[in-house]
Amino acid sequence: MPPNTANKAAEIPPFEPIAIIGIGIRGPGGINSLTTLWDTLVERKSHCFPLAKDPRFHRRFNPDDFKALFDGIPDSENVLHSNLFDETPGLDRTYFSLSEREAAGMDVQQKLLLHVAHEALEDAGYSGVEDGSAFDPSTFGVYVATATDEVIQDPRDYDTDIYHLVRTERAFLSGQICFHFGLRGPSSSVDTVCSGSITAINDACRALATGDCRAAIAGGVHVVTPVSGPISFYSIKRAGFLDRTGQCKPFLHNGTGYSRSEGCGLVVMKRLSDAIREGDRIHGVIRGLCIRSMASPKFISQPNGVFQSVALAQAVKISGVDPAAISFVEAHGPGTAKGDLAEVSSLCTVLAQHRDVDNPLTVGSLKGNVGHAEAASGTHSLAKVIAMFQRRRIPPQADFHPSRLNPTLKPFFDKHPIRIIENEEDWNASHRIAIVGNFGASGNAGFMVVEEGSTFQPLEGRDVPKVSSPLPFVISAKDQATLVKLIHLYIDWLKQPSTFLTPLSDISYATTARRFTHPCMISVQADSHLDLAKKLQERPPMIDSSANRTSRQVAFCFSGQGGERVDPRNSTLYNFSASFTDAVDMCFRIVESESLIAEEDIAMLELFALEFGLMEMWKSWGINPVALAGHSFGEYVALVCAGVLTVRDALKLLGIRAALIRARCLDVPGKMAAVRLSVSDVNKCLEQQRSTHVELACVNSDNSVTLAGTPEDLESFRQELLKSYPAAGWHLLNNMTAAFHSRFVQPILADFTNACNEVKVHPSEMVVLSGLLGKMCPVGDAVLQQHDYLVRHCRETNRFGTAISDYQRRNVESETPQPDWIEIGSHSRIISFISLASDQLKFPSHGKTAADGWTTALDTLMRLYSAGHVVDFKDLHNDINPSAHHTDLPLYPFQFEPHVYPARREAKAISTTLASANEVELCPRVPSTELAPLLLNHVMAGYTLCPATTHVALLLAAAASSASSSQHEGRLAYKLFKLKVIAGFTNTTDGWLQVRRHLATSELEIISNDDNKIHITARAEVCKEQDMLESLSLYKPFILPFKSFKSLPTTDVLRKELAYSLFNHTVNYGAHGQVLDRVWIAEDGHQAWGYSTYPGGARTAEGVPTVLRDFSPMLIESTCQLIGFLMNTSMERKDGEAFVTDELGECSIALSKLYETKYVELYASFKMVDGGTAGLGNVFAFDDKGQLISAFRDVRMAKMKIYVLKRLIDRGRKPEQVVNTQHVAPEEVEEDNDANNDLEEKVISVLKAALRLSEIPRDKTLGELGLDSLTAIDVGVQLERLVPHRRDHLTIDPEGNLAALLQILRPAPSPKSLPTTSSTKEIKLTNGDLEVKAISTPPSLPITANGIPTANGVATTNVVPAVNGVTVNGVPKANGVPKANGVYTAKMPTEPATALIANLSPEMMEAISSNPEVVQHAPGRTPLLLIHDGGGTSFAYYSLGNLDRTVIGIHAPGLQEGKGMVNILHATNEYANIARQYLKQHCPGHSKLLIGGWSLGGTISITMAAMFPDLVAGVVTIDTTPPGVGGLTAEEAESVLLHPWSRSDGIHGLVRKQLEQNTRALFANPEYKTTIRNTTVNVPVYVICAKDPFRPPESLHLQDSSSQWLIDFKEPQVAEVMWKSLMGERLLGVQIIPGNHWTMFTPANAKTTTEALRRGLDVIEGWLNKAG
């Protein structure tokens, strides 16, 4: 008997019942669900096998590791058995968005947990959306148990990297689940050895009970690894725990220990009350749980029955369950004599003492089937109990017969009603309650009381009558290929008889509201299981939902009177939507209770109730409008929706208005007519026919109006109208009760005014488009609260169309996306008046009849969802089917990649270019002499190059030779995965190519005689041909519909001769290389069909090497050449550029079929990626029977310049170099280029190795390439060794790209290699593609501490110095040569500029010749023109952040010729002409520009504003000193500005010449000062000034007045006074920002400068809007 615990009963806290609502499981023998687990149990299967003799063991482990440890242990080979997975668990790396290196750095148990967690969460119906339920990611806890590590803590014997910490620290087991699923609640990883699962579940239950989390996922994992496995086997064996003959034998006489197993189990839990309230499917309920240390006083690992009894009794007590009600125990049952004895003893003590004989306690343990999964064993046991709950059956105990019962247990079974069953039987109990026991070798153990979930029925919602109508269904996946597989799984599942037992409404609820939403999806509507299967087989169009759903908005348009009459109480929506029904009933209840509307006007009530009900329905489904518009009568409902009127007041006013109309207007002969003609033409006719007294009642749109008049007047007007406009449409509106919005309603206005005055109106809570005013009324607009608003609305012209146009215009001006439109009413006539942009949509809400209500609304809802709108599917189902429950659905079809264990150090390769001992040759070397005929068919840039298809053929041949010795039988097919070009293009004019394979990873590599250089890497797979053909057939329904464009007149049809004449600019194909006979290119240029008769003769085609006799490269070329042709003829490129293959995601090819067919039909499509520098496409091939026989998916082709390709081949360089663009002296070029290129190549090499990439794209951030926090540390350590000049710790920013990283790593430039202004353009060679790309900050200039640029200072700024636009005290020095007309001109340089220009690179010439140059492109707001500084360039403006407008920079027009300004007034005129031309060509919607500039640019801007007020809207200057300030002479100014520009070569020389001439033109020109002082600036001006003064170096020996060269603006008033004297009232503001003149655009100050500039532009535009 257990000790007396009665005195402690009060201390036991109440246990909060916890619902198990989701489960995921893995076990040996392919167990991956409750169904497969149940099959194992009822079929009495055992998944145990002897390690030494089983191929599964040899695939996963090195037998020598075991042999070394167990050598000397008798009969060890016979002793070692286990229940292992057939294969090491892999990972769908793409699904979890992991880089290759990050995935390789994860522990295999972490990978397994991610997938099982996904399945458990899907089973629970967790969608990852914060919807106010207990499924709140911020309070979702994760508790995971484990007992082993993949890599032992001492890493000395194993290869380690930055991920060693992630792999070995157990905290990452729970952490990875939190990270990848976005769960932010408590997270814990525990280790109590074999009782880990129940401990983790206990921790989760306690956290749920205390409110630490509202949902939790908990369980355990155990995988035996080749790294730690041998040692753990050895330790357990030496401890005597392992059975000597094989499988665990719970309760049997021959049990001597346990058999190890692998597995994983996770359960998702909520508090029972939450699960019931939120409609979760409840697998079981944890009623009580107790964890205690139960070790024997003598030995820690010896179980103690007395202590177990105490824990079990406490678990039962806190559960509140009668022990007699517990009918089953899933025992820990490892099969050890002492363990089984202690456990059975405790069960009898607590549960069987006073038990009736006819209520026996059944005991079982699944360890006899699956072994002991150690840390995962507890969840295995719990999964078994849940499977029993679902089936209400008890499975047999494996290998049990009463005669085999352990003799030590027999007394307990004889004395107590306790049993073990040997045959499956029903679980007959009024309440099925079970105990789950889970014990650990460390003494920690626990018991769990679990009750079946069907006992706790969810709260039923309001009973809404249902009709046989379609329901929505959504299926989504990460990519198209996976979605195709998932659809196939659904089709098979729907055809299973058991699925028909699941209500269709539950399936709809589960697919739409209880699943993760992925980017690639389909949505369908179906009214039965078979209908759903049929719709899925028809392959509905896929939807790309990767865009942010919150970006799309919707507006409501409420219908007016005159449409089809629909009684909302007869609508199918009334029987389907609770929110619609409640809203409609409320309207009728208000009217009937207060008699607000007469029976004669019931049609008006029906229309109002219908529209109000539809509005409430849409809002309940998560479709909330951003704007409301109502056509005539519809504006009443719009005002209710906006909160201006209550429902009661709106109905009251409509009732009064209707009664007044009947009483006073029916005798008035007013009629209405709709006219389809432009408003201007109708107004013209109205003006001409005033005598008819016809009035304009409604402006529906620009081309539709409604007129009012007497029948006679309308007919007369119609006749005259059709004479002038015979095509005009005319329709008399006979169903209108009165001629509203005209003089015919004048008799009711006085009384209606009194009624309106009695109604309380409220500020609008939404945007309303006023038909009365013809404009948009923002939130809270007081005009809607005027009591005469509805009176005027009744009488005056309704300008619905004008209001719509005003709203759309305002959206354009504010750059607000235009919403989609839903018409709220019984038709879709009103939204036809709304003109939409190309990407806008419009939808109806209700069909024309009552029967169309639900189908129309559902179709609109799913179209909205497909278009990217947010739909709250949970609220939808709460509305239409509140009793819906989550149910089982097909599991997500993950695409697993094999797990690779860390290698032993001695197996580590010495060099990446040499084959290590574990690599084998799969194909003989192929000499270049045999390849030569193939190369002659593939000539690029004048070189015979090895084509990609030859590489593919070599890899397929290697895969085939590997498969020949395997178990594959019959016809085979082949797959390649992740083919990457490592070394670019191979010129194999001599030498050889060879394929080698890594045994550990199965990775294939193509190497050459060039120091075993690796050219290609890939993975290969061999499969049965029939399996591949079935897989490929899934794509066929998605491809064939596109065949229709072949017959369209817009399709380009190219025969062979024309096709290859177009293709020759890229590749010159020989006779055997021209495999395409005809090509059809669609109008969009992104799709093509092709036809090739090349197959058939390919086997005997000339030039196929012997080793490739069954893998003809040209035959393969016939299946994929079309994609290269399509990209190179359709993608944007310049002459001398080509798109070349550098990566292939997947290739599937049935070669036997390809050899048999007489021809192939090809379909190819692609999209632009990487900013247009690459294309990503697919190409599929059909044989002559229409069967899909090959697919090349995710073919990536990168842009490359042909001359660059030549250079790479000539020099043997890799295609990842960056070309140095700094122009330096000729004697310095080689030294600087070599140093920069050497560093750059090393950095790229480090990044490629760390990120496991074949290339480092320039346009992606390092984070996008896979650089995570741990990899960044690793990379930083390696890069620090490359940059000894750095003394600080290197921090790598994942948000930066390669250029930013190189900028950090490169040392400060020496005096010999000073960066130039043109370095704001970085010339890159990405994948062999030379391009000029702007970077975020210009290059650095050295400056001293006081801010002046010097030739030997420290680089702390990124801006080229520029001349400041000032005169000196109004007294110009006459350095210029006066012309005869008295105008001063600057001295022209004596040295020619041609030599300087000749030294510039073509890229630099292109950069400085782009004038004007678009710095930022964001159309809409007034463009900003920024004029160059004194150095003649506008590169500094690239440092600015986003200004929300188009920004244009102007270089000095004479920069290339070495010519500066001759006269500032003449130069200003030239710049004005450039600006006018740009406006005319590129900004047709703008007549003026905002202008500005830094330094001299500001001076020119002020001048332009004074001279050309018709062109300039406003000016913003950046540190431009006003004229008349400072004390420098022209000579002194020149010496200051030219001081840092001691060099005179290349671009440096051009900038120096600009400074010389611009300084003289400005400082030596008295005309400028006189003109600008005497000219009024009539545009607004905003001034930005640097806070600190500029201090020239003492070595220049300037006068004291030089300290005033730039004013000290520490006091803003100083600057304001100075500028006020020049600008007057048009000066809107002066802003002082940190820094001095030369630091305005440095990285430290660029953000501040940007913010100041944005503020200045906003102030100017605000002033202009107010003034205009």
Swiss-Prot record:
Start and end residues of each stretch annotated as Malonyl-CoA:ACP transacylase (MAT) domain: 555-863
Pathway it works in: Secondary metabolite biosynthesis
InterPro entries reported in the protein's UniProt record: AB_hydrolase_1, AB_hydrolase_fold, Ac_transferase_dom_sf, ACP-like_sf, Acyl_transferase_dom, Acyl_Trfase/lysoPLipase, Ketoacyl_synth_C, Ketoacyl_synth_N
CDD domains named among the record's database cross-references: PKS
Active site: 194 (for beta-ketoacyl synthase activity), 332 (for beta-ketoacyl synthase activity), 372 (for beta-ketoacyl synthase activity), 632 (for acyl/malonyl transferase activity)
Region (C-terminal hotdog fold): 1050-1206
Annotated region described as Product template (PT) domain, given as residue ranges: 935-1203
Swiss-Prot/TrEMBL catalytic activity: holo-[ACP] + 8 malonyl-CoA + 8 H(+) = atrochrysone carboxyl-[ACP] + 8 CO2 + 8 CoA + 2 H2O
Ranges of residues in domain Carrier: 1234-1322
Keywords on record: Phosphopantetheine, Phosphoprotein, Transferase
One function term, GO molecular function aspect: fatty acid synthase activity
Superkingdom, natural source: Eukaryota
Domain (Ketosynthase family 3 (KS3)): residue spans on this chain: 15-452
Chain intervals for the UniProt region annotation (Proline-rich linker region): 1339-1399
Region annotated Alpha/beta hydrolase superfamily-type thioesterase (TE) domain, chain positions: 1446-1531
Modified-residue entries (O-(pantetheine 4'-phosphoryl)serine), positions: 1269
Residue stretches making up the PKS/mFAS DH domain: 905-1206
Catalytic EC class: transferase
Gene Ontology BP, a term: secondary metabolite biosynthetic process
Record's keyword annotation contains Transit peptide: no
Other comment: PKS1 is part of a new class of atrochrysone carboxylic acid synthases (ACAS) with unusual domain architecture and illustrates how the biosynthesis of bioactive natural metabolites evolvedi ndependently in various groups of life.
Description of its domains: Multidomain protein; including a ketosynthase (KS) that catalyzes repeated decarboxylative condensation to elongate the polyketide backbone; a malonyl-CoA:ACP transacylase (MAT) that selects and transfers the extender unit malonyl-CoA; a product template (PT) domain that controls the immediate cyclization regioselectivity of the reactive polyketide backbone; an acyl-carrier protein (ACP) that serves as the tether of the growing and completed polyketide via its phosphopantetheinyl arm; and an alpha/beta hydrolase superfamily-type thioesterase (TE) domain.
Protein name in the entry: Atrochrysone carboxylic acid synthase PKS1
Species assigned in the record: Calonarius odorifer
